Amino acid sequence: MRSVTQAVRIGGSVCLTAAFLLAVMTGCADEPEAVPSGELFEAAAAGDVTGVRSLLDRGASPDERDGSGRTAVTAAVYAGSAETVRLLVAAGADVDAQDDMRSNAFLALGETGDVAVLDEVLRGNPDVGLTNRFGGTALIPAADRGHVEMVRALLDRTTIDIDHVNNLGWTALLEAVILGDGGPAHQQIVRLLVAAGADRSIGDNAGMTPLQHAQAMGFTEIVSILD
């Protein structure tokens, strides 16, 4: 084996520099500079695709969190950046990791209603049974906020429990009626839930069914769907 003091000569020129020789002799070749904590999270929260890609290439953890425990991928979901979510999921980000408020990348979709981002989160094989701080799945807030296409996608593309009851005693169907405005979006959501087999007989903690709530609130179109 060659001695480390030997230099490779090409055309009589010494090609091994003193600096490299020193690094070899001490066993400490240059290492990449560590990525400062928080940079990846900030880039993800801003939907900065270029920044996230660069930081991941430099060795940043795809599961970096902020002070509230929110992960970078959850922040990217709230930012509505599908490409940022794609990069983080491909790098191994945990889409199930929940923050101090019990939100995560999948549950956040019930709030945002962004189906393009859902496509990327599903690549991470999320546990669709996890619940938020109200004890609800992603379907429930999607239903009450009037996110028609998200409700459709969750019903068509996941195994989410359509009749899950949250801590308030409400299913997605109940919440679509109680917290909805009775308008076209919530009418369509009620149709989707009923067509997918939602149990219309499940009442709230007082025993009132979705139909009874719709009648009490004067939502005639929804009454006609549920009756």
Regions found by a protein language model. Give the residues of each.
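Ankyrin repeat A-helix N-terminal signature
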Residues: 42-47, 75-81, 108-114, 141-147, ...
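Bacterial signal peptide processing site
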Residues: 29-31
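Ankyrin repeat structural motif
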Residues: 48-56, 81-89, 113-122, 147-156, ...
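Ankyrin-repeat inter-repeat connecting loop/turn
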Residues: 62, 95, 128, 161-162, ...
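Leucine-rich solenoid repeat scaffolds
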Residues: 194, 200-227
